[in-house]
Amino acid sequence: MIPVSLVVVVVGGWTAVYLADLVLKSSVYFKHSYEDWLEKNGLSISPFHIRWQTSVFNRAFYSWGRRKARMLYQWFNFGMVFGVIAMFSSFFLLGKTLMQTLAQMMADSPSSSSSSSSSSSSSSSSSIHNEQVLQVVVPGINLPVNQLTYFFAAVLISGVVHEIGHGIAAIREQVRFNGFGIFLFIIYPGAFVDLFTTHLQLISPVQQLRIFCAGIWHNFVLALLGILALVLLPVILLPFYYTGVGVLITEVAEDSPAIGPRGLFVGDLVTHLQDCPVTNVQDWNECLDTIAYEPQIGYCISASTLQQLSFPVRAYKRLDGSTECCNNHSLTDVCFSYRNNFNKRLHTCLPARKAVEATQVCRTNKDCKTSSSSSFCIVPSLETHTRLIKVKHPPQIDMLYVGHPLHLHYTVSITSFIPRFNFLSIDLPVIVETFVKYLISLSGALAIVNAVPCFALDGQWILNSFLDATLTSVIGDNDVKDLIGFFILLGGSVLLAANVTLGLWMVTAR
């Protein structure tokens, strides 16, 4: 949930700003000087909204807009084509997202929750891996509070790049550019450009399209550049960090099951999960997925060692149907099952580390027939979704983790980048990588959402200009053309509102 302290700071801060603004504007002594100061600095204040506009950057915008005229013409032509395609594609994307949300709501409904625990676990796991392209983000709920800096920085940069696109395109089409500004609405930052509306209305629909599509076009290009930077990050950081030999532990949560004297520590290099080699973050995630979805793997043990370590036990069934044969309070012993030479399933309680250390993994006794001595494949008898995982992090002794693989995934932070020198921070590549991922996601989302033909978004003006450019010669009656545009806008607005409303409900009500 959203921390109460954060809400108090935000509401309290805005209340103080608004009251101070109200008092100064009401004061006989400060009213005129305060309003002159606001006007001089391009500031305007209203409840939960601060806006700053300046003409300082006008010279730079005009310089960019008049440089390489032919290249800019082609650049914004590409943007116009992209914008029109994105506008119509957004209907399909929003429709698909809405269907996914409805399907997820039906899957989570009480009527569907009567299925077995294994099938519900499978469906919840699959939903993790089939995430929607568009998803509502609520700080403190599905956006970690400790990543708000990345989020808002990426939002601001995406907004600035978006508006720079509009500004340069407008100057290229001979529309007067009045200024550039930044605003803060509650906690969300953004940017805007001030264009001379009369000039904008006098140019042709195609010219208008180039201007209106420029913002989402620049966001799309920024997202592509972010993807390129993410792919090339190992090469960019190669002089300082190397990759491909394992994953480095950067943080272990205080409540993580991996904490302990023989657990994982910051700076450990993990090379294997069970028999699954780990060379990067993707390998780590794939190995954990495989371990979670496949049956518990076994370990080969010789008959003599098994006889030496085992002792008489009384097995009993747990509530989930699995078998337990050790003391519930034991921190070192684990119940194992195996088949003897007569193919009879037996259970024995063994000290876990001695049983699985320096042994090969197996599925059946046949996998252990590598020597003349008799061997058995012993499999940990654990609760349904619990796994025993041997984590190799040399030179330390292997960690034996018992729990759900997802708990290891969510409570241990890792990176593929290993510093070449001791003075280098292990967090720097993570910071860069995380920020670039946010920039890709938010810039791409800004391009998609703004392309939707919806009231008050770029999509509204893109649609109007597109209809003016294509239907004016076909439909002589402007009222009919406007009616067509209105119904398309209405459909896009309803579709977007439905996605946002249901998305918020899914995020906050679950």
Curated annotation (Swiss-Prot):
Keyword entries, A-Z: Cholesterol metabolism, Cytoplasm, Glycoprotein, Golgi apparatus, Hydrolase, Lipid metabolism, Membrane, Metal-binding, Metalloprotease, Protease, Steroid metabolism, Sterol metabolism, Transmembrane, Transmembrane helix, Zinc
Entry annotated with the keyword Zinc: yes
Xref: SUPFAM superfamilies: PDZ domain-like
Cofactor descriptive note: Binds 1 zinc ion per subunit.
Classification via InterPro entries: MBTPS2, PDZ_sf, Peptidase_M50
One GO location term (cellular component): cytoplasm
Binding site for Zn(2+): 162, 166
Cytoplasmic topological domain residue ranges: 1-3, 505-510
GO biological process entries: bone maturation; cholesterol metabolic process; membrane protein intracellular domain proteolysis; mitotic G2 DNA damage checkpoint signaling; positive regulation of cholesterol biosynthetic process; positive regulation of transcription by RNA polymerase II; protein maturation; regulation of response to endoplasmic reticulum stress
List of catalytic residues: 163
Described purpose of this protein according to its UniProt entry: Zinc metalloprotease that mediates intramembrane proteolysis of proteins such as ATF6, ATF6B, SREBF1/SREBP1 and SREBF2/SREBP2. Catalyzes the second step in the proteolytic activation of the sterol regulatory element-binding proteins (SREBPs) SREBF1/SREBP1 and SREBF2/SREBP2: cleaves SREBPs within the first transmembrane segment, thereby releasing the N-terminal segment with a portion of the transmembrane segment attached. Mature N-terminal SREBP fragments shuttle to the nucleus and activate gene transcription.
Family: Belongs to the peptidase M50A family.
Protein name: Membrane-bound transcription factor site-2 protease
Species this protein is from: Cricetulus griseus (Chinese hamster)
